Curated annotation (Swiss-Prot):
It holds the Pfam family ATP-cone. HAMAP family: NrdR. Its cofactor is Zn(2+). Keywords: ATP-binding, DNA-binding, Metal-binding, Nucleotide-binding, Repressor, Transcription, Transcription regulation, Zinc, Zinc-finger. This is Transcriptional repressor NrdR. Residues 49-139 form the ATP-cone domain. InterPro entries: ATP-cone_dom, NrdR-like_N, RNR_NrdR-like. Binds 1 zinc ion. GO terms for biological process: negative regulation of DNA-templated transcription.
Amino acid sequence: MRCPACHHNGTRVLDSRPAHEGRSIRRRRECESCNHRFTTFEMIEEVPLIVVKKDGTRQEFSSDKILRGLIRACEKRPVPLETLEGIVNEVERELRGQGKNEVDSKEIGELVMERLANVDDVAYVRFASVYRQFKDINVFIQELKELMERDDR
């Protein structure tokens, strides 16, 4: 590792510890030449996950985009942000665990809705109405019936 102060190539690691929820390692280093101390982070380089949208276009997976949709669906609902972040993390973990490079947006939406249904029924219906693009009231009513049947079990 090259020292940022004197550009000498020799450094030694003084301390290492997990960072960012275990997804990276924080290392405290010291230059062997000038004794300058600095911090580095080491993380796994993940292969980008590509989302295939309904129209066939492709874009890189964005956990922020899912979180924004969940926040919108949960507006004025008693759902903590940590719960929504947990849903996003679970969905991303499941998708990356499949080992595929591409995933359909439909699969992402279904995974999100599956988890959101266990958190808040109103938020679930809001999310579903946007995600499934309800065309008329009958589709909306059918979704509500399915939700009520699921809750009765």
